[in-house]
Amino acid sequence: MTLDISKYPHLALANTPDELRLLPVESLPEVCDELRTYLLNSVSQSSGHFASGLGAVELTVALHHVYNTPFDHLIWDVGHQAYPHKILTGRRDQMSTIRQKDGIHPFPWRGESEYDVLSVGHSSTSISAGLGMAIAANKEGLGRKVVSVIGDGAITAGMAFEAMNHAGDVHSDMLVILNDNEMSISENVGALNNHLARLLSGSLYTTIREGGKKVLAGAPPIKELVKRAEEHIKGMVVPGTMFEELGFNYIGPVDGHDVTELVKTLKNMRNLKGPQFLHIMTKKGKGYAPAEADPINYHAVPKFDLSQNPLPKAANAKPTFSKIFGDWLCDMAAEDEKLMAITPAMREGSGMVRFSKEYPSQYFDVAIAEQHAVTLASGMAIGGYNPIVAIYSTFLQRGYDQLIHDVAIMELPVMFAIDRGGLVGADGQTHQGAFDLSFMRCIPNIVIMAPSDENECRQMLYTGHKHQGPSAVRYPRGNGLGAEIQKEMTALEIGKGIIRRQGEKIAILNFGTMLEYALEAAEKLNATVADMRFVKPLDEELILELAANHDVLVTVEENAIAGGAGSGVIEFMMKSKCLKPVLNIGLPDRFVEQGTQQELHTALEIDAAGIEKKIRDYIA
């Protein structure tokens, strides 16, 4: 989207932070208005993360106006709110390509811009990384400043508090900004706190505060009394006592949509010593009424018409695997009052909205706390209940030790419903579910299932729920294949696959929803196709049978080849001294970039044509 100067006269003067810093503070409200309008028009035409960026416009402008980026390090947690940052850092005309194949990255990305000092995508990493950069900057001695911006959801994660606890201990110079969009600010409270922020971050207060510390250093009881008095006074008007206890100087909350006041406060705080904490209040979706009213559904959007509401929906779309899971969850809860469902802040994405409303006493959203989610399930299982952890593949990585230490070692009946297994598409490297089969397969005591369609997914969920030990059902993002759903639920025989097509010479061992591709390729090759169903335990009897009756075995999976299901097949064959050629088809040994799922399947040659080509090349 090329900038029309007549519509954006102020924004046209700020294509980079250097240009923005040349503008007078008085013009920044107009810059913000135009930036918000540009963001609205751009994302509505390209798709992408929407509501978060709209709420961070004034903060972004103020930060780049006050701080000398990229010399000063500005870190965005997760990165959903970083679209305005991308627009102001030389990528304005490329915004129409965001999240698209070969386009600009959906999150801050080091390889894309010198202004993106940390590649992100998962939450709650900004304070730890910022503290590391602050320590390095202190040793460097060049006066480099470090700012970490984190949201009210991300700051609930344990990693964020671990970082703040350490920051208070080492006392490095850094600023943490909490972008709190949980509520709107009333005019009076906003004005009062803006005034307090200027007062508490100003040089007079800071000088008195630091001078008092030195004077009272020799009288610890009095020093402690004064410290408590200061915290008490702050606590009467601002909710910052907890952050003060962690060693931060807390300022706020202030109006995050008053760019002039933000600039004043940030200028005051820029040269303060030690860890600083600025709490700002913003409105997610600011400037677009439908997004303000429904920020969850407007978190990420398809292409849409700004003049129309609600967002467009695909006509007659097949149900998603997430919906299949959500419907199964409700059906199962009707039979099992001991079923407990846990999600780490992924209610909508995991298809759990209906369940949360129909079975609220059995539903637990633990916020962004994957480690806690897994061990919470462990405790529930010990207590005699039947917990299910609904989690994205990419986020299960964050609870890996708990999966091993708190579930698998004790062989507890916890089932993991792993959504977004395989390639998720537009969110790129940080979100592809490429590794779960590999990192789970090496864990003893766990049953791992990979359904080939939505009905098999439903039956596997039932199988895992009834299994008296750890289990995982791994399914992809997006719509199902149109398979007929059997209402009746039947437990599958653990570790048994089935033949889906009988051929000769070549046997394709399929794991998961690549089955459709495998069958299409098999028609061209006259190959046998087995739906293996179980990654662990493998159907060893079926593998030996296929090896005995075919010249070549081919494994197909939407997971990293390294350590994946295909690796398991080869390991078993070597152990059994079954010396037959085996071709592994799956994801390559690299982080897979963004694009639609279909684009990536084609590019990586794991669609039907790619599978056929790889097999023909192998047997040539």
UniProtKB/Swiss-Prot annotation:
Cofactor: Mg(2+); thiamine diphosphate
Catalytic activity as recorded in UniProt: D-glyceraldehyde 3-phosphate + pyruvate + H(+) = 1-deoxy-D-xylulose 5-phosphate + CO2
GO molecular function, one term: thiamine pyrophosphate binding
The keyword Heme is assigned to this record: no
Cofactor notes: Binds 1 Mg(2+) ion per subunit. Binds 1 thiamine pyrophosphate per subunit.
Enzyme class: transferase
A GO cellular component annotation in the UniProt record: cytosol
InterPro entries, per database record: Dxylulose-5-P_synthase (IPR005477), THDP-binding (IPR029061), Transketo_C/PFOR_II (IPR009014), Transketolase-like_Pyr-bd (IPR005475), Transketolase_BS (IPR020826), Transketolase_C (IPR033248), Transketolase_CS (IPR049557)
SUPFAM superfamilies, A to Z: Thiamin diphosphate-binding fold (THDP-binding) (SSF52518), TK C-terminal domain-like (SSF52922)
Binding-site positions, Mg(2+): 152, 181
Gene3D superfamilies: 3.40.50.920, 3.40.50.970
Known pathway: Metabolic intermediate biosynthesis; 1-deoxy-D-xylulose 5-phosphate biosynthesis; 1-deoxy-D-xylulose 5-phosphate from D-glyceraldehyde 3-phosphate and pyruvate: step 1/1
Keyword set, alphabetical order: Isoprene biosynthesis, Magnesium, Metal-binding, Thiamine biosynthesis, Thiamine pyrophosphate, Transferase
Positions annotated to bind thiamine diphosphate: 80, 121-123, 153-154, 181, 288, 370
The keyword Disulfide bond belongs to this UniProt entry's keyword annotation: no
A biological-process GO annotation: terpenoid biosynthetic process
Known EC number: 2.2.1.7
Pfam families: DXP_synthase_N, Transket_pyr, Transketolase_C
NCBIfam families referenced in this protein's UniProt entry, alphabetically: dxs (TIGR00204), PRK05444.2-2 (NF003933)
Function: Catalyzes the acyloin condensation reaction between C atoms 2 and 3 of pyruvate and glyceraldehyde 3-phosphate to yield 1-deoxy-D-xylulose-5-phosphate (DXP).
Subunit note: Homodimer.
Family, per entry: Belongs to the transketolase family. DXPS subfamily.
Name assigned to this protein: 1-deoxy-D-xylulose-5-phosphate synthase
